[in-house]
Amino acid sequence: MVHYKLTYFNARGLAEISRQLFHMAGVEFEDERINEEKFSQLKPTFPSGQVPILCIDGAQFSQSTAIARYLARKFGFVGQTAEEELQADEVVDTFKDFIESFRKFVIAVLSGESEEILKNIREEVIKPAVKTYTAYLKAILEKSSSGYLVGNELTWADLVIADNLTTLINAELLDIENDKLLKEFREKIIETPKLKEWLAKRPETRF
């Protein structure tokens, strides 16, 4: 039996989608959560000096998107055709572009910056980025007959976006109660039985 170990901090962050994919597929894995001290000790042993790290029977692999894409493909969450797989990748890459603007806010929060600085980042960087990003998502959902972002089945793109919407809500950067389309999409995904089970028992973290 293959042994999987996923190493990351005690946060959703860059490892959460991989964790969700393991649970959605019903595949056992070791969810190793490390602190900064442990990371400093292990860093020299990691391929790129970064986490998350997926260890498969002792072989290490890095890069969060590569890991999640591998698991999605292996467990059947990439769509039913090559074109659907391409579309799922497109959605995830659009999310990654958006996250670059969001990263500045996360760093400011974790660094303890003043509320004034956080407010400036929200107004000047985050809000315009959120508007463009959510418009892109809603354009896809408006054309969807299934309620999913890609095809007629849940894909890893749905997991990525639903998790990100949760982060935006928690950071008070998205008023989803006034956005019917995104609210219905997020609820559809997080109410998926196996995912709902994981969300109920995972450790509570801010990001």
UniProtKB/Swiss-Prot annotation:
Domain of life the protein comes from? Eukaryota
GST C-terminal domain ranges (all copies): 81-207
Bilayer-crossing regions: none
- A Pfam family that the UniProt record links to this protein: GST_N
**What GO MF annotations does this protein's record show?**
glutathione transferase activity
- For the protein in the UniProt heading, the enzyme class is transferase
A single Gene Ontology biological process assigned to it is: glutathione metabolic process
> Keywords, A to Z?
Transferase
User: Does this UniProt record's set of keywords contain Transferase?
Assistant: yes
Q: Which PROSITE patterns does this one have?
A: GST_CTER (PS50405), GST_NTER (PS50404)
Which reaction is recorded as catalysed by this protein? RX + glutathione = an S-substituted glutathione + a halide anion + H(+)
Cystine bridges: which residues? none
Q: Which CDD domains match?
A: GST_C_Sigma_like (cd03192), GST_N_Sigma_like (cd03039)
Under the heading Gene3D superfamilies, the entry gives: 1.20.1050.10, Glutaredoxin (3.40.30.10)
Start and end residues of each GST N-terminal domain? 2-79
Q: What is its EC number?
A: 2.5.1.18
Q: Which InterPro entries match?
A: Glutathione-S-Trfase_C-like, Glutathione-S-Trfase_C_sf, Glutathione_S-Trfase, Glutathione_S-Trfase_N, GST_C, GST_superfamily, Thioredoxin-like_sf
Q: Which residues bind glutathione?
A: 8, 43, 49-51, 63-64
**Family assignment?**
Belongs to the GST superfamily. Sigma family.
Function summary: Conjugation of reduced glutathione to a wide number of exogenous and endogenous hydrophobic electrophiles.
State what protein this is by name.
Glutathione S-transferase 3
The species this protein belongs to is Caenorhabditis elegans
Q: Which gene is this protein's source?
A: gst-3
